[in-house]
From Swiss-Prot:
GO terms for molecular function: ribonuclease P activity; rRNA binding; structural constituent of ribosome. One of its GO terms (cellular component) is ribosome. Part of the 50S ribosomal subunit. Probably part of the RNase P complex. This is Large ribosomal subunit protein eL8. Coiled coil: none annotated. Belongs to the eukaryotic ribosomal protein eL8 family. Multifunctional RNA-binding protein that recognizes the K-turn motif in ribosomal RNA, the RNA component of RNase P, box H/ACA, box C/D and box C'/D' sRNAs. GO terms for biological process: ribosome biogenesis; translation; tRNA 5'-leader removal. It comes from Sulfurisphaera tokodaii (strain DSM 16993 / JCM 10545 / NBRC 100140 / 7). Signal peptide: none annotated. InterPro entries: eL8/uL1-like, Ribosomal_eL30-like_sf, Ribosomal_eL8-like_CS, Ribosomal_eL8/eL30/eS12/Gad45, Ribosomal_eL8/Nhp2, Ribosomal_eL8_arc. It is found in: Cytoplasm. Its main location: cytoplasm.
């Protein structure tokens, strides 16, 4: 399966798992936004510390604007393979196409590590 047009770089499975773990921890001890509307608003307001986008979203247009918006606002973003797993990490019973970490809480160190690895991946992709 080819990757969606909005996916700008590949994320290794171990990093994707760390991202989901960071979302879980931030949900419990910090603050997150769930879903594309809330995520978009958090990015536009400059509140997001990390944006997480699922790569299995249909239609792609639902999240296609997020990578560009994040780059414009200088907010790091990363991909996870499953909207269902992202929804579960957010504490939802349903899938989530995207989410944003606003306050990482106890996930601060994990978030810093993720952002560093994402910058390295983006450097390789360009």
């Amino acid at each position: 399966m080819s990757k969606p047009s909005y996916v700008k770089f590949d994320v290794p499975e171990d990093l994707a798992n760390k991202v989901l773990d960071a979302v879980r921890k931030a949900k419990e001890s910090g603050k997150i936004k769930k879903g594309t509307n809330e995520t978009t608003k958090a990015v536009e307001r400059g509140q997001a510390k990390l944006v997480v986008i699922a790569t299995d979203v249909q239609p792609e247009e639902i999240v296609a604007h997020l990578p560009l918006l994040c780059e414009e606002k200088k907010i790091p973003y990363v991909y996870v393979p499953s909207k269902k797993a992202l929804g579960e990490a957010c504490g939802l019973q349903v899938a989530a196409a995207s989410a944003a970490i606003i306050d990482p809480g106890e996930a601060k160190d994990l978030l810093d590590e993720i952002v560093k690895r994402v910058e390295e991946l983006k450097g390789k992709a360009s």
